Amino acid sequence: MSIEERVKKIIVEQLGVKEDEVKPEASFVEDLGADSLDTVELVMALEEEFDIEIPDEEAEKITTVQSAIDYVQNNQ
């Protein structure tokens, strides 16, 4: 499974959204209905899945599906 597929799977699981809603440009808050707790849990799930640490100042910049994919790809 590619990084993109794994990130999307985590987003579907964490936010309880349909897979076809998880488009690269989708915003977690505006498009996928996440709140601040959801986004924290999403970052924690990404850290666990990819065995990386995402500092708070970086986590704040991860606001869309594509930004999450890009961050993981650049920090693997």
UniProtKB/Swiss-Prot annotation:
Which key words tag this protein in UniProt? Answer: Cytoplasm, Fatty acid biosynthesis, Fatty acid metabolism, Lipid biosynthesis, Lipid metabolism, Phosphopantetheine, Phosphoprotein
Q: Does the keyword Oxidoreductase apply?
A: no
Cellular component per GO?
A: cytosol; membrane
Q: Which positions form S-S bridges?
A: none
Looking at the record, the residues that make up the Carrier domain are 1-76
InterPro entries linked: ACP, ACP-like_sf, PP-bd_ACP, Ppantetheine_attach_site
Localization (cell)? Cytoplasm
Q: Provide any one GO MF term from the record.
A: acyl binding
Could you tell me which residues carry O-(pantetheine 4'-phosphoryl)serine?
A: 36
What processes in GO biological process is this protein linked to? lipid A biosynthetic process
How does the record describe the protein's post-translational processing? 4'-phosphopantetheine is transferred from CoA to a specific serine of apo-ACP by AcpS. This modification is essential for activity because fatty acids are bound in thioester linkage to the sulfhydryl of the prosthetic group.
Pfam name, any one? PP-binding
Pathway as given in its UniProt record: Lipid metabolism; fatty acid biosynthesis
Please give the superkingdom of this protein's source: Bacteria
Q: What does this protein do?
A: Carrier of the growing fatty acid chain in fatty acid biosynthesis.
* Family membership noted in the UniProt record: Belongs to the acyl carrier protein (ACP) family.
| Annotated PANTHER family | ACYL CARRIER PROTEIN, CARRIER DOMAIN-CONTAINING PROTEIN
Q: What is this protein called?
A: Acyl carrier protein
Q: What is the lineage of its organism?
A: Bacteria, Pseudomonadati, Pseudomonadota, Gammaproteobacteria, Pasteurellales
> Gene encoding this chain?
acpP
